[in-house]
Structures are given as structure tokens and as C-alpha cells.
A protein has these predicted regions:
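ATP-binding N-terminal substructure of ATP-dependent carboxylate-amine bond-forming enzymes
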Residues: 1-96, 305-307, 324, 351-356, ...
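A structural supersecondary motif
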Residues: 254, 267, 340-355
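Short acidic-hydrophobic, aromatic-tinged amphipathic segments that line or gate anion-handling sites
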Residues: 46-52, 122-126, 155-157
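ATP-dependent carboxylate/phosphate-activation module, predominantly the ATP-grasp catalytic core
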Residues: 183-249, 253, 260, 272-296, ...
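Conserved ATP-binding module of the ATP-grasp superfamily
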Residues: 117-119, 136, 140-143, 155-191, ...
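Flexible, glycine/charged-enriched surface loops at secondary-structure junctions
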Residues: 180, 251-256, 307-313, 394-395
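A conserved helix-loop-beta module that forms one wall/lid of the active-site cleft
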Residues: 86-153
């Protein structure tokens, strides 16, 4: 009998996973996606719908009767995957774990229950509640939707006068109209990526983040391995495995963000039961850790399938986000260098002649990225490559 494999969320970020699925024999590949903007693959059938519309998702699954379901790098797709896995008794994350992963308020409550170190927080839905929180806690504070994606709606509040603007800016990105306000923890931001193996969660890659500035909660680069000493690195990796266990995740990839303060205390920002975006799980972590997460996820998700895991040489990797000045693009040069360099694992610059570039305000509207690998000095290699990029603007 043929496998009926359903993959949910099939944009450019999922291409490495989709490529491997289409190599499988005796398998039909089905998909659900937001729209028809990504037409690279010939699926057996595909449903276009809002992934928050669970009625459409379940109806399509009922129609095809999948024997496997997968997703990666997308919170809403993760939620759909968990529901379909539960309904059809398939391998996958549980509905409980998916909800803890995508709902910041539920995750914060789980942290309290399990004694996971986290910032003091409160659930809010009004401006007055922010003022009340600020009376008990010193500025700066952070406000964020409980159900956003990336850094959309995450706003740092430095003074009493900034509260009203911050509230509405955050509310724009809240699906439920609910947000959390929390203490701002000053320190080094890091990410830890891992996988839930049969014996338990394992940390595979630690990276340090650089920010555009202190108030805008947007990263400009993420470096693997992180710029930390070996003792602290080992402490963080062990802590992450403990956090993932306490949150209850037991299937698939994990992607967690932490802040390390000046006392080397480790505060959880959030931990997702999925891979990190911008090819973090499918390109970056394998090339840094040597572990083929894509093949591992396929083998764990599809019964009676055991494909050979690919071999990767462990290297330094830099995910460099691009931040161009605003203006109308007349011409862009230097892409030929990115296309031919063996040090470039992947890149995405969705800018063409005539486009108007706006200022970066969140993870979602950054101007592109380049993923660079090197045995040593990956930042130097990255800078040399990116220096070839040049945008000429209309006057």
C-alpha cells in the first residue's frame, strides 16, 4: 500500500524537507498551505487555506486519510500537524505540546509549574494592566502577543510615556487580543536547537544572537557555535535538555531562545517544538552539528520508512540577516558571488528592481539573509562575501 504523506506548510523554508519526501518510493505527497504562491512541486493534491482554520485542515485530512503527517518551522502548521497526528493515530507531537509550544502564556505557566527560570510576567488585555505591572516592576519591560510569529508585536517599553503606543503596536499582531507583559532581562541572547530522540531530548547547536539595536527586538546575525566559553556553553546545553523535558516535548525538533544575564543565570524566552526558521533546522543545524535533522524527522514520522541519514562535515555557520537602507531599488549587483561561492549554503534576497525597501521593524520584514559556512572565522568569510552586494537606488 502506498504511503499517503501530508506535509503542512510548504513554503521556501520547507524545501529541503519536501525535496527528501519526493525522493521516497511508493509514496504520494499531499500538502496544505496558506496560498498558491509556492508552486515548485507536483503534489498528489493540495489544499489552500488559513492554517488557523482547523475545519478546512481536518476536512482535507479526512478526504485523503494520511498515513503520515509532517511540518517544520511554522507554528500554525505545528498545531495542525498535532491535531492530524492525534486524530489519525500517527507519529507526531501531541496537541498539548503543540499548544505549549505556540502559546506564550501557556508556556509561561508551564515554566512556573516546572520551576524553569523565566522573566516575571502577567497576562494582559488592557493598557491599565500594563500600568499596574509597571508599578510592581521597574522599566524597561517587554510586551508581546501570546500567539504571534517571530518578533512581530514584541515591543520594549522604556518609560511610562511609551505604554499606549506599545500596547496598540503589540495588539496589531495578537490573534486572540491577549498579550503578556514581562520584565526585561538584560544579557546575551542565544538559541539552542535540538531533537527529541528515543532516549530523550538532546541539544545539538548553540548560537549567539546580535541585535540591530537594543530597543528593536530584531536579530542581525546568529552564529554557530556561539561566542561563549566552553564551561558556560556546556551548562546551557544541559539546561536546555532539562527545559525541553520539563515542557514535555518528546517528538521532533526543538528550537529554544534564552537570555544569559551577567550572573550567568539562564532565562527561557520561549521554546518551540519545531525547527527554527530561515533554514535553521534543515540546513544550518545539520551543517554545524553533523546531525541530519530532515532525514531523522522523516524516519520518525513515517512508519516503515528508514532512509539513510546524510553525512555533514561539522563547521562554523553564520546566519547573516541583511539590512539595507530604505529607498527604491534601481539595480542590485553581487548576487553572482553568492551563487558561485562554496561557502554559501543558501541565501534569500526577495528584492528586485523597482521594489521599495522599507526600514526593518521585525523579524518578518528583514531584507533577506545569507547562510555562510567556514571551518574557521565564519564572520570574516561572511563579511567578505556580503561586501560584494551593492544596491543602487533611484534618485
Amino acid at each position: 500500500m502506498k504511503n499517503k504523506i501530508l506535509i503542512i506548510g510548504v513554503g521556501w523554508e520547507q524545501e529541503p524537507l519536501i525535496d527528501e519526501l519526493f525522493k521516497l518510493t511508493n509514496s504520494d505527497i499531499y500538502a496544505i498551505h496558506y496560498d498558491n504562491s509556492h508552486k515548485k512541486y507536483n503534489y498528489k493534491d493540495i489544499r489552500y487555506c488559513d492554517l488557523k482554520n482547523m475545519t478546512e485542515v481536518i476536512d482535507f485530512a479526512d478526504k485523503i486519510q494520511p498515513t503520515a503527517v509532517l511540518s517544520d518551522q511554522d507554528d500554525y502548521a505545528l498545531s495542525c500537524q498535532a491535531v492530524i497526528a492525534s486524530k489519525f493515530n500517527l507519529p507526531g507531537p501531541s496537541i498539548t505540546n503543540a499548544q505549549i509550544s505556540i502559546n506564550k502564556y501557556l508556556q509561561r505557566n508551564k515554566c512556573k509549574e516546572q520551576n524553569i527560570k523565566h522573566p516575571e510576567f502577567a497576562l494582559i488585555y488592557s493598557i491599565e494592566q500594563i500600568y499596574s505591572f509597571s508599578k510592581k516592576n521597574n522599566y524597561p519591560i517587554i510586551i508581546k502577543p501570546i500567539d504571534n510569529r517571530g518578533s512581530q508585536g514584541v515591543v520594549k517599553i522604556n518609560t511610562h510615556q511609551e505604554v499606549v503606543h506599545a500596547f496598540y503596536e503589540s495588539l496589531k499582531y495578537s490573534i486572540s487580543g491577549l498579550m503578556i507583559v514581562e520584565n526585561f532581562i538584560s544579557g546575551q541572547e542565544i538559541t539552542v536547537d535540538g531533537y527529541c530522540f528515543g532516549e530523550g531530548p538532546r541539544s545539538l547547536a548553540l548560537a549567539t544572537k546580535g541585535k540591530i539595536n537594543n530597543d528593536l527586538q530584531v536579530s542581525f546575525d546568529i552564529k554557530y557555535p556561539g561566542d561563549l566559553d566552553i564551561v558556560l556553553t556546556k551548562k546551557i546545553l544541559r539546561n536546555n535538555e532539562d527545559v525541553i523535558k520539563k515542557l514535555g516535548y518528546n517528538f521532533g525538533m526543538t528550537h529554544a531562545e534564552y537570555i544569559i544575564d551577567d550572573k550567568e543565570d539562564i532565562y527561557l524566552v520561549e521554546a518551540a517544538n519545531r525547527g527554527g526558521g530561515c533554514f535553521t533546522s534543515e540546513i544550518i543545524v545539520p551543517n554545524h552539528s553533523g546531525v541530519d535533522l530532515v532525514s531523522k524527522l522523516i524516519n520518525d514520522s513515517i512508519l516503515n520508512v528508514n532512509i539513510n541519514e546524510r553525512v555533514f562535515e561539522k563547521k562554523e555557520v553564520l546566519l547573516k540577516f541583511l539590512n539595507f537602507k530604505p529607498g527604491v531599488v534601481k539595480n542590485i549587483t553581487g548576487l553572482d558571488i553568492l551563487n558561485t561561492s562554496p561557502d554559501v549554503l543558501s541565501y534569500r534576497i526577495p528584492i528586485i528592481k523597482g521594489d521599495e525597501i522599507s526600514m526593518t521593524t521585525s523579524d518578518a520584514n528583514r531584507h533577506g539573509f545569507v547562510i555562510v559556512q567556514s571551518k574557521l572565522n565564519v564572520r570574516t568569510v561572511s563579511n567578505n562575501l556580503i561586501n560584494h552586494l551593492n544596491i543602487e537606488y533611484e534618485i
